[in-house]
């Protein structure tokens, strides 16, 4: 039986661990933290599973493989919601919406009443839009917790340690999933900046 050590228990490490367990491997997860939390990039992820929208600027493999992502996450967790993606623009920006449509697939055009049905809070504000019905989103923190629990429940082991990948590699198959922390080995590695903003203002529509 194949045995593998995975260093890093963020989203990448957990996905690798789950996939290897599903193929009958013995898996050990090693991370310097006991649980997922604010220290991990994936803790702050938006959770969009929107490969067709990503296709506006992403390469073909992102779209092709991304189309499988919602099914995978739905099979492994209960964190997925399939409600589609709605893209709208102000009247003065309809050329941008048309450009977005030219660069993407997997959508249908929607008019004002359809937009109102999809998103009542947008009623009477937009005359046209694009609806990517097959797209989804997940709750990242719930997904991380459930994926970790399933890995441990199905025989995966966990070691809390600030691991040296080179040391583990001498013992056997080792997969480095430390993310940005791997910059000590991959000197040109860079992070992708993102922001999360949560707004709650019930009195303003």
Question: What residue ranges belong to the model's regions?
Answer:
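Extreme N-terminal leader/targeting segments of oxidoreductases
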Residues: 1-4, 128-129
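N-terminal Rossmann-like FAD-binding beta1-loop-alpha1 element of flavoenzymes
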Residues: 3-28
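Short beta-strand/turn micro-motifs composed of small residues
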Residues: 8, 31, 89-90
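Glycine-rich FAD pyrophosphate-binding loop
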Residues: 22-41
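Short loop/edge segments at beta-strand edges and connector loops
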Residues: 31, 111-112, 158-163
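Dinucleotide-binding Rossmann-like beta1-alpha1 core, especially the glycine-rich loop
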Residues: 46-118
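Helical element adjacent to the flavin cofactor pocket in flavoenzyme catalytic cores
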Residues: 126, 130-173, 177
């Amino acid at each position: 039986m194949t045995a593998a050590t995975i260093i890093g228990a963020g989203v990448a490490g957990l996905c690798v661990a789950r996939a290897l367990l599903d193929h009958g491997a013995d898996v050990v997860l090693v991370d310097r933290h006991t649980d997922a939390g604010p220290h991990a990039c994936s803790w702050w992820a938006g959770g969009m599973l929107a490969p067709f929208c990503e296709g506006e600027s992403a390469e073909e493999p992102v779209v092709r493989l991304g189309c499988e992502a919602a099914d995978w996450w739905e099979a492994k967790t209960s964190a997925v919601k399939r409600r589609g993606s709605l893209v709208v623009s102000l009247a003065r920006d309809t050329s941008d919406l048309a450009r977005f449509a030219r660069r993407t697939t997997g959508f249908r055009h929607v008019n004002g009443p359809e937009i109102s049905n999809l998103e009542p809070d947008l009623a009477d504000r937009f005359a046209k839009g694009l609806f990517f019905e097959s797209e989804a989103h997940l709750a990242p923190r719930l997904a991380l917790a459930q994926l970790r629990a399933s890995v441990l429940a199905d025989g995966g082991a966990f070691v809390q340690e600030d691991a040296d990948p080179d040391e583990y590699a001498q013992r056997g198959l080792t997969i480095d999933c430390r993310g940005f922390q791997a910059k000590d080995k991959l000197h040109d590695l860079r992070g992708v900046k993102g922001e999360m903003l949560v707004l709650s203002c019930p009195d303003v529509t």
